[in-house]
């Protein structure tokens, strides 16, 4: 693997994407049998991409798949296996020395495993023995709240519903979830602002908008199929404006791999009409600057007798809180706005002009907005900006959070939440004849804190790589090994499985692409995308191993062993997933006619009240919510000279690392790098390719013991005073305390650091 830093000149997509897909297929898949499965991905009679949550178009191409979707499916259907012979040759201690890419690249897990401390190896056991032993451990705890039930966004609606049902019959609301680490500020912030913790737009709105503002996200890597929608809106004359600390190729220009003319002529579509490199942590200042200009110009228009710039009728009829927001915004000083955002008043005025001129605007955002200690307030400032011109609840306009995992939103909808509503618990209890717990449980941060303090005794993970994804893994690694029980439901080996508890189990499950055969026949599961579309997913491939079970079957097996007097007919439900969906419909009325509607091509849309201008808030209206000050992250209040954000590489999806390249950013064969601007490199007196150390700072500006040594400097077009490193390697640079008090999300995108040359 050749290591090099070399500027990538191509557009997003294009032949670079085709070559990358070919390499992934060649390395992982049986080309004769498995490649054909790609033609069934994102199709009504096929399976949903296990990657991002971007919705499927109504009229899709015959090959509706993106580069990273292809990597995800190649990773899943690999013919490599991690079985008993693998563990006979590799102790847990030796595997801990492997890289995270190497661990998952070893192949698919194909049989149930139990950790044996004497040999330091995982050893196979039968499914029933695994269920019985896990059930016995869970029965032994005096308090159900000593167990943490983690969920990954790859889990289907059906499995997630059974999982929360089991945990609540057991007696716990402890549901740490991957959404706690990515879009919890969306769920909390949007719910407070507009009454619904989800986005308000549909894919069709991109066909009607005048302007799309993309802020704090990177579609070329994280949701590449979005590029097709951005290309289409630009082609018809609408505008897209990008706001991001780094220049990301997927926001700049795109060659559509499915467009023969562009591929044969190496032509491309320019996406962003303007690109603003806001400083890391400067989004709130920028947004308040835009709102201040809009209000001042609206006042001037009113004084001159010209038409209002804002939607006064909408504000008067549908909102509360505008006067307080107005006072706050007008009191924001320009010198502070410019200093914190890194943008001039002139640049912010250009943005305000573009927004004012557009009749219908969509704002798309990702974790660059949410992963801050004031991430919830960031989201609410985006809503404030949209509300000022009535851009919620009309065609071609709205808020568009870009979720990560393909069903992270669906899991939450069907009950994976530590704070369930009274109504949900009442309907759940009525359906099954038991009283669910009403005391709020743990989200991700509280869950890990409970593990670190010894309050938690067991951790069950429905997918994911919990230990690696969380902050401060050095502090949490030892407490994880001191748990009494750890159960990992997984398709591939990862680092969390190697932090073994007193009793540790790995339970292998089917992938999204594989046939799920139950007593009534082959089953379909359902997922919810970022735009609240529910659709079916049916595996088409032969399972990687004969012992694999579905997630639903695994949950039912553990539940039956743990709760022998359960009021739930677990086996009956798993025999036919239509029965699970009937129960979901009974508990959640918005799923009316569930089984009928998922059999329609494309599925159905869950009604979004805010998109219809029905505000399910205590005030009965949409709320302008003021955030005091301009700082996204109080831990940077001492005016740190450098702020670091963690990001994915292009060969990565969440904690899964497909390869060591980051093509669009020009990094190949390595991940031990730090990105900075040429201006910042000059200030720090370092050059491209030199090695430096980063030291995390405490809230009072002092050097901590958390550090990253010998990172290679990559000079890159981006904002100054901003550094970027890769997730999850840099997660240890923040502590469990560095989180948003409103949503609990860790501040992965604003870590104050100090830089020094390496010896």
UniProtKB/Swiss-Prot annotation:
Binds 1 [4Fe-4S] cluster. This is Protein YdeP. InterPro entries: Asp_de-COase-like_dom_sf, MopB_CT_YdeP, Mopterin_OxRdtase, Mopterin_OxRdtse_a_bac, Prok_molybdopt-oxidoreductase, YdeP_MopB. Its cofactor is [4Fe-4S] cluster; Mo-bis(molybdopterin guanine dinucleotide). [4Fe-4S] cluster binds at residues 49, 52. It comes from Escherichia coli O157:H7. Keywords: 4Fe-4S, Iron, Iron-sulfur, Metal-binding, Molybdenum, Oxidoreductase. Transmembrane segments: none annotated. The lineage of its organism: Bacteria, Pseudomonadati, Pseudomonadota, Gammaproteobacteria, Enterobacterales. It comes from the Bacteria. CDD domains: MopB_CT_ydeP, MopB_ydeP. Probably involved in acid resistance.
